[in-house]
């Protein structure tokens, strides 16, 4: 999808998709399309996860043991694979949130430095 200069949507920072998926699944099991919709809704439509990024990430998280998947029926009465957090996925989410907080603080110190005598 081509973006225009006035498009308010934001690009996901590299490495944040896994964290967003894990956080979204803290609210409960969800199918892939629902995870993408939840990220979009919770970000006030600023973040959109493309299918080509979402499903490889889900498979990677299952392979790492952070998610479990099982087939079920969606709200549209369609067969869908539902994902849920595992205990190790919850632990990973805590680690990811801690790293994210550190990153935000570090960037904040650069973007909003304390005034110095030189300024």
Located regions from the model:
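Short, Lys/Arg-enriched N-terminal segment that forms or immediately precedes the first helix
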Residues: 1-10
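N-terminal helix-turn-helix DNA-binding core of bacterial DNA-binding proteins
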Residues: 9-55
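Short, structured helix-loop boundary elements
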Residues: 10, 51, 79-82, 97, ...
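Short, well-ordered turn and helix-capping elements at secondary-structure junctions
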Residues: 39, 43, 71-73, 87-89
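Residue-level detection of the helix-turn-helix DNA-binding "recognition helix"
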Residues: 40, 59, 63
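Beta-hairpin "wing" of winged helix-turn-helix
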Residues: 62-78, 84
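Amphipathic alpha-helical dimerization/coiled-coil segments
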Residues: 88-119
């Amino acid at each position: 999808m081509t973006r225009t200069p006035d498009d308010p949507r934001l690009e996901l920072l590299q490495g944040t998709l896994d964290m967003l998926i894990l956080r979204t699944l803290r609210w409960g099991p969800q199918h892939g399309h629902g995870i993408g919709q939840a990220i979009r809704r919770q970000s006030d439509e600023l973040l959109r996860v493309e299918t080509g990024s979402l499903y490889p990430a889900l498979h990677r998280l299952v392979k790492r043991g952070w998610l479990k998947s099982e087939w079920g029926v969606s709200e549209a009465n369609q067969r869908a694979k539902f994902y849920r957090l595992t205990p190790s996925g919850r632990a990973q989410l805590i680690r990811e949130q801690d790293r994210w907080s550190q990153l935000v603080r570090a960037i904040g110190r650069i973007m909003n430095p304390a005034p110095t005598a030189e300024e």
